[in-house]
């Protein structure tokens, strides 16, 4: 005998309209009701082909990775690490580009959820502000887990990202232990939280060591040209730091290349440290020391968090989880003094 929605309603005590919404995977339904209805449908041998997303979830998790994709090694390395993590977790990851996310992401995500192909989403859009995330809460249903990989103060969505404060702190500590006392920094865009965290960690370590001085700062923008400009600004300022922390690898590469063109030796005249440990650091001459961010580790933590939301937990808001970072030392830093 053909199983109908009426049979499931009789089995569970829920209304036919509630059962229809659960089987269609639309609307906001409690996790308890959703699970009871799906279990009843399975017991009664209701055709799984009529349950939205059922077959997909049984085989693998379909994850949408939503980002405002930009040219360059950073995004390529980020996606490569996330894809390797998805493979390890037996999930399927799709890279989806949303241009101008602050204007378009609400409709983009609403349409994506309505298509019923993806089970959950990862958002990596560093341009989004708190008000943008608050707007997203209005379009994300409870049954559709979403995690952000972009840092903001006082997270709105569940957020998993790297510990930028620790990265900045470790950078200053490496300089100190290597014998450098007069140091400088090329910052990232002040509007981006990760830039501020890296700077604050660096500055706090220096402030806690009276014999160490931050003698030069430059406001960069994470782009190659700001690395070039920062070198010329440093030379014009005559501040003469012994070591410089550049808050991403692209600026660090530009700084080192410009130094070499101007007959300034790295590391003999000045030590350099970047951030993210992209492939360019290994391929440069000299090779560049960098704060390593493990994108595969980030991906594993993010996908496991998404999996843990099924079937009972739904979305968790405002939780920030930080992935540890470390430093990879290469030719751009040398030991200036013997350390006891």
Model-derived segments and spans:
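N-terminal helix-turn-helix DNA-binding module of bacterial transcription factors
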Residues: 1-58
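Glycine-rich phosphate-binding loop signature in dinucleotide/nucleotide-binding domains
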Residues: 44, 115-118, 178, 234-240, ...
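Alpha-helical recognition/docking segments in bacterial nutrient-uptake
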Residues: 58-173, 236, 340
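Periplasmic-binding protein-like
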Residues: 64, 117-126, 184-186, 218, ...
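Hinge/beta->alpha junction and helix N-cap segments in small-molecule ligand-binding domains
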Residues: 67-77, 95-105, 160-170, 186-207, ...
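Short acidic capping loops at alpha-helix termini that bridge into adjacent secondary structure
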Residues: 182, 213-215, 266-272
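Flexible loop/turn connectors
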Residues: 232-340
């Amino acid at each position: 005998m053909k199983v109908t929605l009426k049979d499931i309603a009789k089995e569970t005590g829920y209304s036919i309209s509630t059962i229809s919404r659960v089987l269609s995977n639309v609307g906001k339904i409690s996790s308890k009701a959703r699970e009871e209805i799906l279990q009843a449908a399975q017991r009664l041998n209701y055709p799984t082909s009529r349950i939205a997303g059922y077959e997909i979830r049984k085989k693998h998790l379909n994850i949408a990775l939503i980002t405002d994709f930009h040219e360059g090694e950073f995004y390529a390395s980020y996606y490569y690490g996330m894809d390797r993590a998805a493979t390890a977790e037996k999930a399927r990851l799709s890279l989806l580009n949303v241009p101008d996310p602050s204007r378009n992401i609400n409709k983009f995500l609403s349409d994506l959820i309505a298509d019923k192909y993806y089970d959950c989403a990862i958002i990596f859009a560093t341009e989004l502000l708190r008000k943008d995330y608050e707007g997203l809460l209005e379009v994300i249903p409870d049954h559709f887990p979403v995690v952000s990989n972009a840092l903001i103060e006082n997270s709105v969505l569940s957020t998993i990202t790297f510990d930028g404060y620790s990265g900045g702190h470790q950078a200053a500590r490496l300089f100190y232990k290597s014998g450098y006392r007069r140091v400088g920094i090329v910052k990232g865009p002040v509007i981006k939280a990760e830039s501020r965290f890296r700077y604050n960690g660096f500055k706090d370590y220096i402030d806690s060591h009276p014999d160490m001085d931050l003698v030069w700062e430059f406001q960069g923008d994470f782009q190659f040209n700001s690395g070039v400009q920062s070198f010329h600004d440093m030379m014009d300022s005559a501040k003469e730091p012994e070591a410089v922390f550049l808050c991403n690898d692209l600026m660090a590469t530009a700084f080192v290349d410009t130094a070499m063109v101007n007959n300034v030796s790295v590391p003999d005249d000045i030590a350099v440290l970047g951030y993210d440990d992209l492939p360019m650091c290994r391929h440069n001459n000299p090779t560049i020391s960098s704060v390593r961010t493990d994108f595969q580790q980030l991906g594993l933590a993010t996908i496991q968090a998404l999996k843990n939301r099924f079937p009972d937990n739904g979305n968790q808001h405002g939780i920030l989880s930080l992935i540890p970072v470390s430093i990879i030392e290469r030719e751009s830093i040398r030991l200036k003094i013997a350390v006891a």
